[in-house]
Structure formats: structure tokens, C-alpha cells
């Protein structure tokens, strides 16, 4: 599956051709797609672009399919505007988390991490920071779905400018299925000063190995923790990994090499 400003697209031949499967059900602005691990018929889509350029377009909540994208139904969070990430608990398809960035142009309380335990019928806000800081990233520990990491991002947009960073831009950890959260971006080794957007990933080979890519003027770049976020090591400051942070800032742990990690950007 893929998503762009033109909705959700599906391929059944390894990417050679794609077919739009969202026209007629919801708008073209899409920020997140999640597919249930043990049932690929179950799909969630979050509206609103993640790459918040000046011409960014917003979405209108979560949509769900139970027939691999043939049909869709509205699944809540109508005021979310921008949903950068949706994750489904691999042990229970009815448990779903949504990172809601919210309205980019004005303060709103419709931000944060939301959780559903009934397959998207109802949602509960489980992490809220302030009315200018929404949730950007959520990841589950691949070895223990009770453990989650989430980043929140203070960001405001106008048609001609973007303000990234400040109070509310933080990294968080939960060890109880998202019911409570502890801030880990103030732990030893994490950068200080004004922090912007944060990407995070957990190694499937060792749950204690956590990587983060952090927007920070003085010490932005890649950070590694070997103890589940208790302490951090600054591993790479290359600007080529962190330029245009608001556009990229995604990081992924290698599934075969515990020291392998991937960051998307432009050279």
C-alpha cells in the first residue's frame, strides 16, 4: 500500500502497477497507513499530510477497511487534521494507537496520542502535552507490545513560514500499553536547548537498543540508547542526516544487524 496527496494506492504485483482504492470514500490527503499483522484485510488510514510544506493539505480523521481496501468506513478523530502515524498491536487487532499532530495553524486540544481498544469505534487520549504540541511518532517494542515510544512536536505553520521546536517537543515511553507515559528526552545524554521533531525506532534484536533522530541546533543528529532510553549516546551529527528535519526525521532499525540503522534524507 502507498499514500500520497492522491489518496491510498494498492499494488498486487510487487509494485509494478498501483490502483487507487480510496476515491469516493475520503479525501486525498493521507499521513498514515497501518495494516494488521495477522489479518491484512484490516487497514487503518490517518488523514493529513506529514510533510508540512506551505501547501500542506489536511485530513479529517481515521478510516478503516476490513476487506483489504475494497470499502472504507469512518473511524473517528474528525478534528485530528494531521495523523503522522497509526500502529496496531500485533497481539490484538482491536488495540490501535494514533499519533495526532493536530491543526498546524492554531492552538487546539485535539492533539496527542490516542488509543482505541475496540477496533477504532471509540478513542481515548492517553498522552497530551499542550495545545501547540502534537504527536509525531509512535512505535511499539517489536518484542513486547506493552512498551511504546512516542514523540511530541511543537510546530506551527503559516502559508509562508514554519516554527519548529520548543516546550512540548519531547520523547516519551510507556510500559503499560500506553495508559501512562514517562518523559525520556530529559535523560542523560539527550540534547538540551530547543528540540524540534524527533523520530524513534526500536531494534527487534534487542529491545534495549533504541535509536532517535533529533532536531536540535547545537547537537542535532542520531542518538542511541542501550538501556531502553535511560541514557543516550550521540552517534552522528552529520547535517546530511538531519537537514529539512520537518520534512524527514524518520529512522528505522535494521532487522538483521543490531548496529544497523537507516535514516531517510537527501545528500
PLM features per residue range, with description:
Residues 1-267:
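Beta-propeller blade termini and top-face loops
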